[in-house]
Regions:
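Catalytic core of PPM/PP2C metal-dependent serine/threonine phosphatase domains
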Residues: 24-94, 163-172, 178-179
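Residue-level marker for buried hydrophobic side chains located in beta-strands
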Residues: 12, 83, 128-130
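Acidic loop->beta-strand submotif enriched in PP2C/PPM serine/threonine phosphatases
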Residues: 1-6, 64-67, 99-139, 167-171
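N-terminal entry segment of metal-dependent catalytic domains or homologous docking segments
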Residues: 1-17, 22, 28-32, 88, ...
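Active-site-proximal, acidic helix/loop segment immediately C-terminal to a metal-coordinating Asp/Glu
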Residues: 16-40, 122, 126-171, 183-185
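Short strand-connecting beta-turns/loops that link adjacent beta-strands
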Residues: 6-7, 74-76, 184
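Activation on terminal intrinsically disordered regulatory regions flanking enzyme cores
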Residues: 104, 108, 172-185
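Short, surface-exposed beta-strand-loop junctions and turns on beta-sheet-rich folds
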Residues: 17-18, 86-89, 96-98, 136-137
Length: 185
């Protein structure tokens, strides 16, 4: 989570493909680099293009990573999502749930990789949720339907449920980020 200006806040999530040290390094590399690129004034799309190219030429082994960027425009009250191989995000508003997903490949697979970009208007009380693929969509939907929970309670409940649903020795990582929107006075 970082600010690029007084009016913009970014949340970035990346999940290295595969397991172990290589996947961890690819996701750390992607988050670190996208943060620095955006903070230096680069757009999300240009930063994605550069990371895609860098993962393709990095070392002899294949390097892939999902890239999930949420840009909150504080004055305009909008959120923009850039998704490249990322799990669905969710917008919870007034008891309803909207999934924000895409079909783009993870960064590093194709020479030309076009991310999915979408934008939504935000309202007071909205809850935005980003997760890694270790959190199943059905679990997120179930937890978010619980009215009255604050962002921390949502993350805690969702994390506990996702851990309980691990089966067959599956040890995929679980990352959950929630942001609740409050109107400025």
């Amino acid at each position: 989570v970082f600010d690029s200006s007084v009016n913009e806040k970014y949340i970035v999530l990346s999940d290295g493909m595969g397991t172990g040290k290589r996947a961890r390094l690819d996701s750390l590399f992607s988050v670190s680099l996208v943060t620095r690129l955006i903070q230096s004034g680069m757009s999300m799309q240009t930063a994605h293009r550069l990371i895609n190219s860098m993962l393709r030429v990095k070392g002899w082994e294949e390097s892939f990573a999902t890239l999930d960027i949420m840009r909150l425009e504080l004055n305009g009250g909008t959120v923009q999502f850039l998704k490249s191989g990322a799990a669905q995000s969710f917008l919870f508003r007034d008891g309803g749930l909207k999934a924000i997903g895409g079909q783009a490949f993870p960064a590093g697979i194709l020479a030309e990789c076009t991310p999915d970009v979408s934008e939504l208007k935000l309202f007071d009380g909205d809850v935005l949720l980003m997760t890694s693929d270790g959190v199943e969509d059905a679990t997120a939907r179930e937890i978010l339907r619980c009215n009255g929970m604050n962002a921390q309670e949502i993350v805690t409940a969702l994390g506990a449920k996702a851990l309980a649903q691990r089966t067959g020795g599956r040890r995929d990582d679980i990352t959950i980020i929630a942001a609740k929107i409050f109107l400025r006075d």
